[in-house]
Regions:
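Intrinsic-disorder/low-complexity, polar/charged segments enriched in Ser/Thr/Lys/Arg/Asp/Glu/Gln
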Residues: 2-8, 33, 45, 62, ...
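Hydrophobic ligand-binding cavity/cleft-lining segments
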Residues: 1-45
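Beta-strand/loop substructures that line and gate deep hydrophobic ligand-binding cavities in soluble
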Residues: 79-133
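A short, structured loop/turn motif at beta-sheet edges
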Residues: 15, 40-43, 68-73, 92-102
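Hydrophobic/aromatic beta-strand elements that line small-molecule binding cavities or substrate pockets
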Residues: 7, 35-36, 62-69, 80, ...
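Glycine-rich portal/gate segments that line the openings of hydrophobic small-molecule binding cavities
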Residues: 39-82, 134, 138-142
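Short amphipathic alpha-helical signal-transduction/dimerization elements
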Residues: 26, 124, 128-143
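Hydrophobic pocket/interface hotspot
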Residues: 18-22, 28, 46-48, 67, ...
Length: 143
C-alpha cells in the first residue's frame, strides 16, 4: 500500500520568502516531528535520522535524502530511501494575483516494513501542520 497526501497552503508573502524556507533541506527536516536529527551533506543530499513509534522498528532509521529536481524559486522535489520506507516529497510555489503565493505539497510513502504506511496514513496531516507552522513562523520572524 502506498500513502499519498497533498495539501496546499496560502501565504501573504512573496514566493522568494517561501522558497527560502522550502528549498532548505535543514528547515524541511527540522519541521517533521519524527526526524530526531539530521546531517546536511551538500546542496542536494542529507541524512534524516527518523524515529517511528511502531513495533517493528526499535531504533532510528537512516533516511538518505536527495533532491532530484530543483527549479528556483518555483519547485523542489526530493526522494528519501531507507530500509523501512521510500518517501518522495514535492513542493511547488505559484504566485497569486495579490502578491502572495500558494505552496502545493505532495508526499508519497512506500513502506517496506509492516506498520510504516499505517503510521504515515494516521500522522501525515499532523506532519503537514508542523511544516505549515514552521514555515509561517519563519515568515513572521525578522530576517
Amino acid at each position: 500500500m502506498t500513502v499519498r497526501v497533498s495539501r496546499t497552503f496560502e501565504f501573504d508573502a512573496p514566493p522568494a520568502d517561501v522558497w527560502a524556507f522550502i528549498s532548505d533541506a535543514e528547515q524541511r527536516a527540522g519541521a517533521i516531528s519524527v526526524v530526531d536529527s539530521f546531517e546536511v551533506h551538500d546542496d542536494r543530499t542529507a541524512t534524516w535520522h527518523v524515529a517511528l513509534p511502531i513495533p517493528m522498528i526499535r531504533s532510528t532509521i537512516d533516511v538518505e535524502t536527495e533532491e532530484v529536481a530543483r527549479d528556483p524559486p518555483n519547485r523542489v522535489k526530493f526522494v528519501g530511501k531507507s530500509r523501512a520506507f521510500r518517501v518522495t516529497g514535492e513542493h511547488e510555489i505559484t504566485e497569486t494575483d495579490d502578491g502572495g503565493c500558494r505552496l502545493a505539497n505532495e508526499f508519497v510513502v512506500d513502506g517496506k516494513l509492516p506498520g510504516v504506511e499505517a503510521f504515515f496514513k494516521r500522522n501525515f496531516d499532523a506532519e503537514l501542520d508542523n511544516l505549515e507552522d514552521a514555515l509561517r513562523a519563519s515568515l513572521a520572524s525578522p530576517a
